[in-house]
Design a protein with these regions (language model features):
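Feature captures hydrophobic
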Residues: 2-148
């Protein structure tokens, strides 16, 4: 039996509000990080993430000059076009940010649906690798029920 049939470990957010709070903190961690933030700004890869189980959409892009490295809107009412579109559950996002979900495998197994310039998204993945440790520390400290 292949591991495609094996259930993924899950840890659920207590509410939609908690999910958004954790994701806002996660994007802030990326934006404020002295290594990740400038590299993500320079990569200039606008992305749209849809989280199906919490019925939320966030669009992320490089920040304006002189401002934060990243900007995001919890809406599709934006004045930029995403290069990459990803659809996943909040549980998949939580596993990914803990370093427990490989995006390429998740796409192949349909846990993540990807559209647009997927190569651009995969190209910035190495930039965000340091986030995993920061995210795990935040989860362990403030949201231990989300550890997987």
């Amino acid at each position: 039996m292949s591991d495609a049939a094996e259930p993924q470990p899950t840890a659920s957010f207590r509410s939609d509000r908690e999910f958004r709070e954790v994701m806002d903190r996660t994007f802030t961690l990326m934006s404020d990080d002295p290594e990740m933030g400038p590299r993500l700004r320079d990569a200039d890869t606008p992305q749209r993430f849809e989280f199906t189980d919490v019925d939320m959409v966030v669009n992320i892009r490089s920040g304006e000059p002189g401002g934060p490295n990243l900007a995001w809107e919890w809406s599709d009412e934006i004045d930029w076009e995403p290069k990459v579109k990803m659809t996943m559950s909040s549980d998949t996002a939580n596993r990914y940010f803990q370093g427990k979900e490989n995006v390429a495998i998740a796409i192949a197994r349909r846990r993540i649906k990807a559209g647009g310039d997927v190569k651009a998204a995969l190209a910035i993945m190495p930039i965000t690798k340091p986030l995993f440790a920061h995210y795990r520390a935040m989860i362990a400290s403030d949201y231990p029920h989300l550890e997987v």
